[in-house]
Amino acid sequence: MMVEKVVGNITTLEKRVPHIERVYMRSDDLVKRVKRVVTDHGKEIGIRLKEHQELQDGDILYMDDHNMIVISVLEDDVLTIKPTSMQQMGEIAHQLGNRHLPAQFEGNEMIVQYDYLVEELLQKLSIPFTRENRKMKQAFRPIGHRHE
C-alpha cells in the first residue's frame, strides 16, 4: 500500500471505525517525506507525501468503514527544564542556543533531547529539570546555521 496524503487526525475524528492498526514511529521520522513502515499487524506501507507536510501523532494514513491506520509516536528520552526565574531561563536558553540545540516549549517547560553534557550543565547552573520519556507532539528539528 502506498500513502500519499494524510486522511485526518484521530483527535479530531468524529466517526470511529471498529478496528485500528498502528504504525509506531520515532519523532525524528515525522519530518521524512518518504519512508517505509510496518503496522502492528504486519502490513507494509510506503509513505510518499506529495506536499511538504510533517506527520503528527494520531495522523490517519488510511481509513475505510472497518479499519484505519494511525501513526503513534514513540516516547523520546528528554530533559524537561523548569527554570524558576527569567535569569535561569535566559542562562539556559543562551547556552543551548550556542550549541544549536533544538528545543520545544510546553507551558513553562523547555524540552530538549537527552544529552549528558546538557544534564551536567543544568546541574552546574542549579536549574531544575527532570529526565523523562515523553511523547513529543512534533519532531526535534535540526537548526540550520552559519557563522560569517
UniProtKB/Swiss-Prot annotation:
Alphabetical UniProt keywords: Chaperone, Cytoplasm, Nickel, Nickel insertion
GO CC entries: cytoplasm
SMART domains in alphabetical order: UreE_N
GO molecular function, one term: unfolded protein binding
Signal peptide: none
Localization of this protein: Cytoplasm
Chief location category: cytoplasm
Cross-referenced InterPro entries: UreE, UreE_C_dom, UreE_N, UreE_N_sf
CDD domains per record: UreE (cd00571)
Any one of the GO BP annotations: protein-containing complex assembly
TM stretches of this protein: none
Similarity section: Belongs to the UreE family.
Role description: Involved in urease metallocenter assembly. Binds nickel. Probably functions as a nickel donor during metallocenter assembly.
Full protein name: Urease accessory protein UreE
